[in-house]
C-alpha cells in the first residue's frame, strides 16, 4: 500500500476510531479505545501523604499552638477539618484567626498531645488517669467521635470510687447515657457513699434525682439523706421534707426464669427464682407446659416460649398473673432456633434453627407483639442452629451454635453474625469467637457476656471488636457442663446445672470489678435446662 492509498486508509481508520459508537457495536472493541479509570485507593493515599508531609517531615505548618510552654507546629486545614472549634476560630474575625501563635489555657500538655495524635492519625490511647480530662476537652474542642468513645469508656468503668464525680461530669456535658450509668452505680452503692466528700457536697438536684430513681432498701437511703442534711443543717434543713417525699425504695429481687424438662416427668416447667438481699435464691412458683421447649425469651414483663406438642406453637406466661396463653404460631415448625427480644420495635425475632427434617435454616422472622402476627424478613448469611442471641441497640448478635461444613455435615460454629433490625440486613464479622459450639449470652450496657460449656466466660466488646476472658473461682471449671447467663440490676448471674436433681451452682459477677460471688441456698428441681432469662 503506497502513496495516496496509504494516506486514505489512515484517514478512514482515524475517522472510524473517533466516530460515535454505532448501535450494536461491541463493548469489547470500545474498551480498548476509551474507558474511565478510578483509583479506589486514591483518597486514602492522598490523606496518608498529607499526614506524612505534615507530621514526619514537618512541612507547611502555618500555626503554632502553645500549651503549658510546649509549642506544637500544626496546620489550620487539618485542625479545621476535624474540629468545628478550630474551624470557627480560624474563620472568624477574632485575633486567633490571624495570629501565628495561639496559647491554649484549658488543657494540659499531655492531653493536648493525645488530641493531636487523634486529629492527625485517628488513633489515641485512652488511659484511665486522663480519661475524664480527655472527655471534657474533646467536648470543648468538638471532637465528637472521641467524646462519644470517652463517654462509653467511662460508662463501662464507672465504679463506687468515681460514680458521683462522673455523674457531675455527665450532667455538665449533657450526656444522658453516661449520667444514667453513673446514677445507677450511685444508687446501688449509696450506703458506701453517704459519708464521702463527694456525696456530702452533692447538689440538691442530683441527690433528688438519685433517690427518686429507686434505691434498694438495703442501701439505707433514709440514713444517706440524713447524713447529707446534717453536713450543712442550717442551709439544708429546708430540703428535708421534699427529699423524704422524693425517696423511692425498691426491693432487690432478681427474677430469673429457668425453663427445662424435669427428669421425673414428661412436661417442662417455668420457674421464677428470686435472688434476695443475701443472695439466697428461693423458688416462687411453677407452671406446666407440655412437651419439649425449642426456644424462649423474655419481652417486657412476660415470658415467651416456643414448643409443645406442635413445635411451631408459641406460649406467653404473663408475669403478673402467672397464667399461660397461646400466641400466633410460627409460620413453620422450627427446632433449636434463637428467640431475641427487641424492645425498640416491640418485636421478638426468631433466627436460624433446624427444620423437622434436621436441615439447618437461615430464616429470620419476627413477631409483632401488639399485632400478634409473624412476618418473614431477609435471611442470615450462614444457616445456624442453637446459637446464642443478644440484642444491642437494635442489632442482634448471633453467636456460635452449629453450621454446615463443606460436606454439609454440622460442625460447631465460631461465627458472629450481626442482624440489623432497622435495615433487615445481615453480615458476618471478619473475626471469630474464641470458642465454638452452643453458648448463651447476655447484654450489660454496651458489652456482651458469653458463656459456653466448660470454663469459658468471655466479655465481648462489639465496638472495639475485642474479647476479654474473665477469671473465675476453681469451682467454676470443676465439672464441664452447660452454663446459662442473665443480666439484671447491674449484675451478671450465671447458672450452672450439674445434672443432679436439686443441686446447682449460681454465680453473681460484678461487671465493673469482675468480682465473683457464689449465691447460697439454691435448690432447683430442674435438669436439662433450656434457658435462663432475667
Swiss-Prot record:
<feature type="repeat" description="Kelch 5">
    <location>
        <begin position="448"/>
        <end position="497"/>
    </location>
</feature>
<protein>
    <recommendedName>
        <fullName>Kelch repeat and BTB domain-containing protein 4</fullName>
    </recommendedName>
</protein>
<dbReference type="InterPro" id="IPR000210">
    <property type="entry name" value="BTB/POZ_dom"/>
</dbReference>
<comment type="subunit">
    <text>Component of the BCR(KBTBD4) E3 ubiquitin ligase complex, at least composed of CUL3, KBTBD4 and RBX1.</text>
</comment>
<feature type="domain" description="BACK">
    <location>
        <begin position="163"/>
        <end position="255"/>
    </location>
</feature>
<dbReference type="Pfam" id="PF07646">
    <property type="entry name" value="Kelch_2"/>
</dbReference>
<dbReference type="Pfam" id="PF07707">
    <property type="entry name" value="BACK"/>
</dbReference>
<keyword id="KW-0677">Repeat</keyword>
<dbReference type="InterPro" id="IPR011333">
    <property type="entry name" value="SKP1/BTB/POZ_sf"/>
</dbReference>
<comment type="function">
    <text>Substrate-specific adapter of a BCR (BTB-CUL3-RBX1) E3 ubiquitin ligase complex which targets CoREST corepressor complex components RCOR1, KDM1A/LSD1 and HDAC2 for proteasomal degradation. RCOR1 is likely to be the primary target while degradation of KDM1A and HDAC2 is likely due to their association with RCOR1. Also targets RCOR3, MIER2 and MIER3 for proteasomal degradation as well as associated proteins ZNF217 and RREB1. Degradation is dependent on the presence of an ELM2 domain in the target proteins.</text>
</comment>
<dbReference type="InterPro" id="IPR011498">
    <property type="entry name" value="Kelch_2"/>
</dbReference>
<feature type="repeat" description="Kelch 3">
    <location>
        <begin position="347"/>
        <end position="394"/>
    </location>
</feature>
<dbReference type="InterPro" id="IPR015915">
    <property type="entry name" value="Kelch-typ_b-propeller"/>
</dbReference>
<dbReference type="InterPro" id="IPR042949">
    <property type="entry name" value="KBTBD4_BTB_POZ"/>
</dbReference>
<feature type="repeat" description="Kelch 4">
    <location>
        <begin position="396"/>
        <end position="446"/>
    </location>
</feature>
<keyword id="KW-0880">Kelch repeat</keyword>
<dbReference type="Pfam" id="PF00651">
    <property type="entry name" value="BTB"/>
</dbReference>
<feature type="region of interest" description="Disordered">
    <location>
        <begin position="1"/>
        <end position="25"/>
    </location>
</feature>
<feature type="domain" description="BTB">
    <location>
        <begin position="61"/>
        <end position="128"/>
    </location>
</feature>
<dbReference type="InterPro" id="IPR017096">
    <property type="entry name" value="BTB-kelch_protein"/>
</dbReference>
<dbReference type="InterPro" id="IPR042884">
    <property type="entry name" value="KBTBD4"/>
</dbReference>
<dbReference type="InterPro" id="IPR011705">
    <property type="entry name" value="BACK"/>
</dbReference>
<feature type="repeat" description="Kelch 1">
    <location>
        <begin position="255"/>
        <end position="301"/>
    </location>
</feature>
<feature type="repeat" description="Kelch 2">
    <location>
        <begin position="302"/>
        <end position="344"/>
    </location>
</feature>
<dbReference type="InterPro" id="IPR042950">
    <property type="entry name" value="KBTBD4_BACK"/>
</dbReference>
Amino acid at each position: 500500500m503506497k502513496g495516496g492509498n496509504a494516506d486514505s486508509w489512515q484517514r478512514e481508520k482515524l475517522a472510524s476510531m473517533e466516530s460515535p459508537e454505532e448501535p450494536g457495536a461491541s463493548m469489547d472493541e470500545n474498551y480498548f479505545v476509551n474507558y474511565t479509570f478510578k483509583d479506589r485507593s486514591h483518597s486514602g493515599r492522598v490523606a496518608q501523604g498529607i499526614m506524612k508531609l505534615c507530621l514526619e517531615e514537618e512541612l507547611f505548618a502555618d500555626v503554632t499552638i502553645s500549651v503549658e510552654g510546649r509549642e506544637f507546629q500544626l496546620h489550620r486545614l487539618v485542625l479545621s477539618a476535624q474540629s468545628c472549634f478550630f474551624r470557627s476560630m480560624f474563620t472568624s474575625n477574632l485575633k486567633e484567626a490571624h495570629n501565628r501563635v495561639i496559647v491554649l489555657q484549658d488543657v494540659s500538655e499531655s492531653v493536648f498531645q493525645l488530641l493531636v495524635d487523634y486529629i492527625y492519625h485517628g488513633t489515641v490511647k485512652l488511659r484511665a488517669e486522663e480519661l475524664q480530662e480527655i472527655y471534657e476537652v474533646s467536648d470543648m474542642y468538638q471532637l465528637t467521635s472521641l467524646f462519644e468513645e470517652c463517654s462509653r469508656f467511662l460508662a463501662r468503668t464507672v465504679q463506687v470510687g468515681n460514680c458521683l464525680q462522673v455523674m457531675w461530669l455527665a450532667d455538665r456535658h449533657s450526656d444522658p447515657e453516661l449520667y444514667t450509668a453513673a446514677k445507677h452505680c450511685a444508687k446501688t452503692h449509696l450506703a458506701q457513699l453517704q459519708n464521702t466528700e463527694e456525696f456530702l457536697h452533692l447538689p440538691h438536684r442530683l441527690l433528688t434525682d438519685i433517690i427518686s430513681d429507686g434505691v434498694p432498701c438495703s442501701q439505707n437511703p433514709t440514713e444517706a439523706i440524713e447524713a447529707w442534711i446534717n453536713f450543712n443543717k442550717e442551709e439544708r434543713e429546708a430540703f428535708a421534707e421534699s427529699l423524704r417525699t422524693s425517696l423511692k425504695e425498691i426491693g432487690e429481687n432478681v427474677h430469673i426464669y429457668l425453663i427445662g424438662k424435669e427428669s421425673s416427668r414428661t412436661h417442662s416447667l417455668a420457674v421464677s427464682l428470686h435472688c434476695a438481699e443475701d443472695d439466697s435464691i428461693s423458688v416462687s412458683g411453677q407452671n406446666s407446659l407440655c412437651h419439649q421447649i425449642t426456644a424462649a425469651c423474655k419481652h417486657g414483663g412476660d415470658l415467651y416460649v416456643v414448643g409443645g406438642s406442635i413445635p411451631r406453637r408459641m406460649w406467653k406466661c404473663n408475669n403478673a398473673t402467672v397464667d399461660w396463653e397461646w400466641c400466633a404460631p410460627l409460620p413453620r415448625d422450627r427446632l433449636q432456633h434463637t428467640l431475641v427480644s427487641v424492645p425498640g420495635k416491640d418485636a421478638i425475632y426468631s433466627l436460624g434453627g433446624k427444620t423437622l427434617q434436621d436441615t439447618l435454616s437461615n430464616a429470620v422472622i419476627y413477631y409483632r407483639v401488639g399485632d400478634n402476627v409473624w412476618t418473614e424478613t431477609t435471611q442470615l448469611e450462614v444457616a445456624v442452629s442453637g446459637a446464642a442471641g443478644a440484642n444491642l441497640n437494635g442489632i442482634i448478635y448471633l453467636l456460635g451454635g452449629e453450621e454446615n461444613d463443606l460436606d454439609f455435615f454440622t460442625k460447631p460454629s465460631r461465627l458472629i453474625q450481626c442482624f440489623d433490625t432497622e435495615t433487615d440486613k445481615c453480615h458476618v464479622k471478619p473475626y471469630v469467637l474464641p470458642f465454638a459450639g452452643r453458648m448463651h449470652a447476655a447484654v450489660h450496657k454496651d458489652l456482651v457476656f458469653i458463656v459456653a460449656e466448660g470454663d469459658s466466660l468471655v466479655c465481648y466488646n462489639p465496638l472495639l471488636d475485642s474479647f476479654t476472658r474473665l477469671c473465675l473461682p476453681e469451682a467454676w471449671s470443676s465439672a464441664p457442663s452447660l452454663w446459662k447467663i442473665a443480666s439484671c440490676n447491674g449484675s451478671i448471674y450465671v447458672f450452672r446445672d450439674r445434672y443432679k436433681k436439686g443441686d446447682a451452682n449460681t454465680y453473681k459477677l460484678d461487671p465493673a470489678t469482675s468480682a465473683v460471688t457464689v449465691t447460697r441456698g439454691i435448690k432447683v428441681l430442674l435438669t436439662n435446662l433450656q434457658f435462663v432469662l432475667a
